[in-house]
Structures are given as C-alpha cells and as structure tokens.
C-alpha cells in the first residue's frame, strides 16, 4: 500500500511559490509530505509591484490547512547574498535539501511577449534577464552543494512549453530557451554526483492571472470554455505540482535527468490526476487555432521550420565532433566527480 506521505522527511524549496505554477507545486509537495520552503518577494504588507495580491504567506497557509508543513521565507532570488544566506539557513536547520524547484517568473508586464524585436522596449531588459534567468542560476548554484554532499537530489526548471519557443521579443524568447538549456547543462554536470535536473512545463495553466483574464474563478472555470474551447483542456497549478511530486518520489529519477517533460506526459506515466480528478492532456488536445491571429500562426510556422533546420544541422555537426572525441575511462570520470564534489 502506497504511503499517504511518500515525501515525509524530505526538504523541498520552491523558489517563486507566490502564485501560479510555483504555488501549485508547493501545495503538491506539501500534500505528499515534504517540508516545503516557499520563497519569493511578495509577502503581506509588501506585495508585488505588478499589482498581484498573492503572497508566499498565503501559499504556506494553504499547505498548513491541508495538513502539510510549510515555511514562507522572503528571498529576492536576484540578490546572491540573500540566496546564499537562505540556503545557509537550510543547511543549518536540516543539513540536506532533496528538491529544488525554480519557478521564478520574469513578470508578464515586463516580458511583453509578442512584440517584434525591433519594437521591443528595453527599459526593463536588465531586470528581465536578472529576474527570469539569472535568479535561477543563482538559486541552483547555492542549492546544489546541499545535494552534492549526499549524492542525491532533484532540481526542476519550470518552463512554459515543451517545444521550441516562438515570438519576436528577444528577451522573452531568449529566456524561455535558456531555461530549457539550463536544465540540460546542470544535468550533464550533476549526473555523476547522483543529482538529477529536469525541465517541466505545465499545459494550459489556470493561474490566478489567467482566471482573471477569462473572467472566471476556479469554482466555475469551465464557463470560460464557451468562448475558448482550448480552456476546457486546461489544468490547475496543482497538476504540474503533482508531476514534480511524482518525480521526487521516483527512486530512478536520475534516469530522467536532462529531459524536458510536460505535466500531461508525467501524468500518463505516474497515474496522478488534477485536483478535480481529471487528467488533462494538453499534449494531445485538439487545439482550436481559430483563437489565434492568422499572422501569428504563420509566423510561428515559419519560425519553427527555421529552428528545426538549424537544429538538424547542429545535430549533424555535434555528432561528427563527438565521433572524434577520445573516450575517458570510467576511473577518470569517477575521480573527476570526486574532485568536483569536494570543491
């Protein structure tokens, strides 16, 4: 019989647990029995500068009301000294870290997703790169040593899609691609140390902001499907959270390192459902493309075709280069891993 709290005793950090996917992930990890640290910048009395009311305090309280254990800690993940201090606190209190989820967003008002690159307002360029990308690197940098010492752990990068991103804004698209690449690069370095790194994307996410945009609440979200059929295949933030919880429970998760998964794919494999008992599957949804401007669809097609040609050429070159590399002996690899882990 499966344990009611399979992650009991594990320590998890969800960076960006204020709202959206991050909040759902924190809730699902708490539901599975982990002690969850909910970090972010928005706390009571010090809300988001972008007008959002959610706080990490609320997220921690949701977990506690459901019978879980959660601690809200205000951390600005763009400030390395704050991040270093926070993980020092984790080390002192627990001496371990089992799961890190990087769900820090770049804040949509700054991202301006669909503007053409020659029209991009770069006023917030530095802030976007620091908040949406560098924060992830800073956080992983200071979390990893807690996993390396125990030769186990899971780092998850939350991304927006399971395909190559398209859209003109160079800030937005560079960040989206970089987060996928970050998981891949970390996986290569961490695998010899027993630590897994993956990227996971939700499907059509019913975040707080999306519900507001559709003019509905979680209790009546299906009403929005009358205008947008695609929304009927949407998922609550808890669904992607349960995907992360399933990975964290998997004793063979290291075999998955370096991969990109959709929440729906992991649901098929692990058998979990959304909070309402459904199993949404955005990957096989019959998408109604009439909801999107034809100019955008054509641009997306052109961009994707160019990207695939680029990747095909890059794959051939990389394979040719790899065929010329001498293979290191297993002893050499193990020695290097020990040296790296020891600093």
PLM segments and residue spans:
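Active-site loop of short-chain dehydrogenase/reductase
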Residues: 10, 68-69, 96-97, 147-161, ...
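Conserved glycine-rich cofactor-binding loop
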Residues: 11, 18-19
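Conserved glycine-rich Rossmann-like NAD(P)H-binding loop of the short-chain dehydrogenase/reductase
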Residues: 34-58
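Rossmann-fold cofactor-recognition segment
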Residues: 61-79
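Catalytic loop of short-chain dehydrogenase/reductase
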Residues: 106-110, 116-124, 128, 154-192, ...
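A short, exposed helix-loop element centered on a Lys and neighboring polar residues
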Residues: 140-141, 184
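C-terminal helical subdomain
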Residues: 199, 218-311, 336
């Amino acid at each position: 019989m499966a344990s009611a709290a399979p992650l009991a005793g594990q320590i998890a950090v969800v960076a960006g647990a204020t709202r959206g996917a991050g909040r759902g992930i924190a809730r699902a990890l708490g539901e599975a029995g982990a002690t969850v640290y909910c970090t972010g910048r928005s706390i009571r009395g010090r809300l988001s500068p972008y007008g959002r009311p959610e706080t990490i305090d609320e997220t921690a309280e949701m977990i506690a009301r459901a019978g879980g254990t959660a601690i809200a800690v205000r951390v600005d993940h763009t400030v390395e000294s704050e991040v270093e201090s926070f993980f020092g606190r984790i080390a002192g209190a627990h001496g371990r870290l089992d799961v890190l989820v990087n769900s820090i967003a770049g804040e949509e008002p700054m991202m301006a997703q669909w503007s053409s690159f020659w029209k991009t307002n770069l006023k917030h360029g530095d802030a976007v790169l620091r908040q949406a990308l560098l924060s992830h690197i800073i956080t992983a940098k200071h979390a990893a040593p807690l996993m390396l010492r125990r030769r186990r752990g899971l780092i998850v990068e939350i991304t927006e899609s399971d395909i190559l991103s398209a859209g003109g804004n160079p800030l937005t698209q560079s960040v989206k691609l970089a987060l996928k690449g970050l998981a891949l690069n970390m996986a290569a370095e961490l695998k010899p140390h027993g630590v897994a790194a993956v990227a996971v994307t939700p499907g059509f996410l019913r975040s707080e902001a999306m519900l507001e945009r559709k003019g509905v609440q979680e209790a009546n979200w299906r009403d929005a499907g009358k205008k947008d059929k695609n929304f009927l295949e949407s998922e609550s933030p808890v669904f992607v959270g349960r995907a992360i919880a399933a990975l964290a429970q998997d004793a063979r998760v290291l075999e998955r390192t370096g991969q990109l998964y959709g929440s729906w794919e992991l649901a098929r494999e692990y058998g979990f459902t959304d909070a309402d008992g459904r199993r949404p599957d955005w990957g096989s949804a019959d998408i109604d493309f009439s909801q999107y401007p034809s100019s955008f669809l054509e641009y997306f097609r052109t961009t994707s075709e160019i990207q695939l040609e680029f990747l095909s050429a890059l794959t051939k070159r990389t394979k040719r280069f790899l065929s010329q590399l001498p293979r290191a002996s297993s002893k050499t690899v193990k020695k290097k891993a020990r040296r790296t882990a020891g600093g």
